[in-house]
Structure formats: C-alpha cells, structure tokens
Amino acid sequence: MISLRLLKRNTFSLFKILKCQTMAKSSFEYVKKFEADDSLLPNTWIVVRLDGKCFHKFSEEHDFSKPNDIRALRLMNYAAFTVLREFNDVLLAFGQSDEYSFVFKKSTTLYKRRAAKLLTTINSKFSSSYVFYWKKFFDEEPLKYPPTFDGRVVLYPSDENLIDYMKWRQADVHINNLYNTTFWTLVLQGNLTPQQAEKRLCGTVSADKNEILFQEFKINYNSEPEIFKRGTLLIRKSVFNKNLDKNSNIIVDTHDDMLKDRFWKDHSSLLLNRSKEILMYDGPVTDIVAEQINLIKE
C-alpha cells in the first residue's frame, strides 16, 4: 500500500510540473500568432518550380559540356525522381536545363497545403539528392561546391491552366535549346567569339537558326536528342511484371511532346481526381525504369 503521505507528495510534485508547463505555455506561446497562415487554396493545382541560382557560373566551374551536358541533365532527372519516389502526392514533374516543376495532385492535403512547407521540403529533397548522387553521374569529377536552387509556388485553378503551364515550359525548352545549340555551334565549330555569335543571332527566328545549323554545319536540328529538345517528364505509370504476373507501378522518365493535344487526350485520366484508370508504359527501359524493375524483382 502506498502511504497517504507519499501519495500527497507525488500529487503535489505533479501539480507543480503541470503548473510550470502551463505558465510557460501561456507566457511564450503568443509568438505563434506572428506566423502567417500560408495555406493554399483548396481545389487548385499546386506547382512548385525550382531554378538553379547562378548556374551559368556553376556549369563553368564544373566544366559542363556545351550546349548540353547529358550527365547534368540525368542528375537533375534523378534528383527529381527521388522527390516523386518519396512524395506520392506529387503527380508529375517536368524538367529542363537547371529547372524542375513539380505538380501536386489537386486534392492533396500534404502539410495542410502550407506553401512554405511544400516549397522547402521539395527544394531540400531535390537539392540534397543533387549533391548526394553527384558521383553517380559525374564519376571522379569532384563537386567543388554545392549548388543553390531557388523556388516558388504557383496555383492554377483549372486543368486548362495547368496544361498551358506545362506547354509553356516545354515550348521554353525548344526556344532555349535551339538558340544555345546554334550559339555554341558557331563558337565551337565556327570559331566565332561568344560576342560575335551573339551578334550573328541577334534578330533571327527559328527558321534562321535551323538554316545556319544545316547549311553551314550540316546539323539537322530535328535529329538532336529528344531530351535536349523537349526536356524530361516524370510520370507514374504501370508496367507488366512477368515474375509477379501483374502490373507494377513505377515512375518513368519520358520526352513526350506535351505541346500536342494528342498527349493530353492519351493522358486525360491523369488530371481526374481519384481516377482508377491505369496508364500503361511501353517505352524504353531507361536507367530510372530499370532501377525500379530490378527492385521489384528482388
């Protein structure tokens, strides 16, 4: 039997602890009132877009190939892949050069849709993965200093707005890559200085740049790799697993043409809330796809 005196002593001690905690809470917790409510509007598409900060300098310091370094692009894609792998609420992602956009499911309630939480979590996961997996793509080429990515959160109220956003980002790939391909061809093969190449391209349109590439350097821009011309789309699809005799869900990296309405017709279920339609993948087995298939086999 616990003595009455001991019981009173323990009760009094517990009362003092609870009283101190209550006083501390009431004394200091008022500072939480200064926190802004950044919950994003419901029933809207949330897009987090990350951009490399001072990446021109970063690419020069690390001797990236011009106009495109396939190692750097594959690293960007893999870093984005780790984001989708960890966060199921990210529906798809699209990247090019030093930029990546992450589209959340319209119905997501992740982190109560708080903008700061979503942005910082996606950015930190992506940035840390870029550093962590550097050696996977650059072998013995050392990472001289960690890169910096800034980010923003944008809301799109309708499916049409989101589709136009995706088309805008892919159109940007074409515009930038055609210019950069022509610019660096003039510098590296045409022996022009960067200033001379810039002056040569001033006022030119797409047809002019294609003409320069083909007539002067026998380069057919249409034959350039799709990853350079279209960027990379990461999307969730299914593949048939012969070992398990069923479909397995994976994240695939593709270079589909999102500027064409055909893509959105073929993927119409993608934007439907809680759609049960399965998007099957029959494309090439990329490194990202192969890695997931091998894990399924194990």
Regions found by a protein language model. Name each.
Residues L6-L7, F12-E298:
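Regulatory and interdomain segments flanking nucleotide-handling catalytic cores
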